[in-house]
Amino acid sequence: MKLLKNKCVILAAVLFLAAGMAEGIVYMHYGEFQAQPVMLGRFLRIYPVYNDNGSWLHGRLGIGYIWWLLVCEDILSLLVEVFLIRFISALCDFFSLSRKILMLAAFGVSASAYRLFTRLRGVYVLDYLHVRGYGVFDLPDIYLFLMMVGIILWLLPYHRAYRPYKKEKVKGMPFFLKCVWELKFSGVFLRAAFLPRDRWEGLFQEWR
């Protein structure tokens, strides 16, 4: 587990630096890319634009660029991702699933950390990957997408492990008690996310 944690930290750092380098290169050649975008395929090109809304959500809601709100959102995003990593790790421990998904979670942490770094510098986000028909993105946006895809794929082995376990545990229970069991079971892992890992086994014991 410690080795995997170190790998995740290293991967997140490399991704952070890659996002910074890509943005730096695009920034240095901003005028050139604006005048003549670089085609990377039929649907993808490098075409830089500054996101003066701050984020996609702010643009959709018409909120605009509010610096302190964006910083708070990025901090909250980081905290949620750390919680999600611990929550998934606890489930992997309980069902003896592979923790390789946590490597993809490093993409999300790196994206949020880079977003926060950009906000604290007091500059607009520079988007430069234009996907035809979808919009303009940057590397951190791609990182977040990869993390979401990874979590969706992880749900497949999780569901295969969880379904027979639940079927055995709630056998013969009425519907209401099944719902109560489900809530209590979920609560175990919500608690585990806030506890040191060496206390997880004691928490899981009665649910084995």
Regions found by a protein language model. Name each.
Residues 1-208:
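Alpha-helical transmembrane bundles and membrane-interface segments of multipass inner-membrane proteins
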